[in-house]
């Protein structure tokens, strides 16, 4: 019988229904496990934004879960958990180590040093994000980017722009593999009507993390200058950028067509998708 390919993954907080990296890792891992691969996810310990339903599960849909030691403090949780995950994957019996995001890729050298094949998925040029503009965080993440270029056997990017960036900056060839999207369950407007007064085709939807690099302030400014009876629904959490959330709300003042829902999930999220005009 052929030996199953053993794959370790880290970089996510934990398997979770919400969160960009977390969704990608969960969908990728469960599909690989379904196809016969041995998949282990090294998850962060301590406080998390979501996914509590997976905390007590050693196995989830065929994916083995391991929680690594984590210094549960701002600025240290991601670094410490990634370091321990890299150590565990380097010394474990894995054929491939798949690292997600630039920060965790700082430790790509460790499994590579012990003979593992290393894949890094770049989910964005993280060191350029506003919350990492200066200090240790930006330098650490940028070094992670460089380590991905140097030590990874293969690098995956999610956009053509990032692919061009790696080619122009480092001369590094990458694989362009955009994220897939699960079709949401189609639902009639009910919860969103009761809570927000929204009906089918009555609103334009923005859904995502509320961070400056997504250009949301331009969306708000542009919408305020449009004559329409549609609402602008901005759905998502602030992701450690509460000051930017307040900036957006100040910018939207005086226009009651602009609605902030906060973090949404489950049936509420499906309804927002199903009934948006755009």
Give names to the regions the model predicted.
Residues 76-90, 94-123, 127:
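An aromatic- and histidine-rich active-site surface loop
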Residues 23, 202, 206, 211-225, ...:
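A conserved mid-protein helix/loop that constitutes part of the nucleotide-sugar donor-binding site
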Residues 53-55, 186-198:
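A short helix/loop element that forms part of the nucleotide-sugar donor recognition site in Leloir-type
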Residues 153, 274-278:
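Acidic donor-binding loop of glycosyltransferase active sites
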Residues 161, 180:
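Carbohydrate-associated surface elements
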Residues 87-90, 113, 136-155:
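Membrane-proximal helix-turn-helix segments that form the acceptor-binding/catalytic region
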Residues 50-57, 231-257, 268:
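Short, structured helix-loop element that forms part of the nucleotide-activated donor/catalytic region
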Residues 80, 117, 128-147, 187:
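Nucleotide-sugar donor phosphate/pyrophosphate-binding loop at the beta->alpha transition
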């Amino acid at each position: 019988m052929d030996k199953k390919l053993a794959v370790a993954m880290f970089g996510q907080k934990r398997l979770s229904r919400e969160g960009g990296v977390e969704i990608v890792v969960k969908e990728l891992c469960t599909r690989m496990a379904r196809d016969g691969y041995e998949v282990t996810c090294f998850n962060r310990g301590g406080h998390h934004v979501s996914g509590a339903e997976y905390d007590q599960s050693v196995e989830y849909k065929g994916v083995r879960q391991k929680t690594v030691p984590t210094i549960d403090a701002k600025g240290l949780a991601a670094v410490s958990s990634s370091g321990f995950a890299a150590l565990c994957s380097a010394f474990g019996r894995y054929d491939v180590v798949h690292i997600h995001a630039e920060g965790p890729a700082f430790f790509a050298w460790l499994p590579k040093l012990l003979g593992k094949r290393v894949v890094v998925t770049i989910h964005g040029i993280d060191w350029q994000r506003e919350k990492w503009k200066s200090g240790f965080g930006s330098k650490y993440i940028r070094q992670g980017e460089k380590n991905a270029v140097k030590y990874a056997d293969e690098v995956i990017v999610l956009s053509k722009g990032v692919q061009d960036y790696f080619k122009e900056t480092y001369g590094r060839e990458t694989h362009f593999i955009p994220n897939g999207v699960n079709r949401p369950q189609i639902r009639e407007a009910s919860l969103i009507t009761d809570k927000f007064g929204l009906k089918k085709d009555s609103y334009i939807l923005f859904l995502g993390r509320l961070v400056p690099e997504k250009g949301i302030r331009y969306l708000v400014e542009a919408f305020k200058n449009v004559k329409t009876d549609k609402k602008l629904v901005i759905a998502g959490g602030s992701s450690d950028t509460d000051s930017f959330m307040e900036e957006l709300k100040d910018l939207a003042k005086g226009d009651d067509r602009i609605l902030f829902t906060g973090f949404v999930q489950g049936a509420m999220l499906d309804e927002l998708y199903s009934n948006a005009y755009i």
